[in-house]
């Protein structure tokens, strides 16, 4: 029997000052922009008209442009945005295979996917990557 990966989403209220709150909001906005840019590119697809769903191909097609357009959003956050877009595009591609006519993914939610490189946990606080370095949150 193989190893099963289990993922959980933890919703955590962060205690931050006003400056850190502003940086987090700007980070959320740029993360959303990054995900949308990747989704737009993947939706436009290949010359054969297929939706691009490969994370590697989407990375190659969009990474530099997304980093530039988002004023050098943290690299791990750019990759997380790409993964979010790739998952949404894969869902659309599956729906097309099933004969449905899905609409292009549109990202509006105020959330960011942090991996272990973009967030560091300590006993009493955590540090999170933002558009202007890292902030501390309790």
Residue ranges and their predicted role:
Residues 1-138:
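Nucleic-acid substrate recognition interfaces
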